[in-house]
Amino acid sequence: MTNQQTEEYIYKICSIKNWKTAKQTGVFKGFGIDLIDGYIHFSSKDQVKETARLHFNGEKELLLLKVETKNLEIKWEKSRKDQLFPHLYDELPLSEIVSVFELKLDENNKHLFPSYLDD
């Protein structure tokens, strides 16, 4: 099921290693489950912290990519708990990434997110 939900920005958590590969090739192709499923998994602002907790809990050397959606064909499809998640069935041009934030861990091994996600 798809929905034409719109958000100005969506978010992708990736490793520093995957980011370095993307910078070398000029596009982000995703990794792991993205390559298996045939699309890049993203999260909305309201979903990204839960995505980190469920899929990247305690992992180091991670980045948060903030991606502008206006030039992308994003499909919103049901996933975890029937929520609609943004998916991209294409490579992500690096020009659509507006910021890269290092996700450090706090003393409890939880990721620290940028304050703009709390707005």
Predicted segments, located by residue:
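Conserved, structured core segments of small domains
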Residues: 2-119
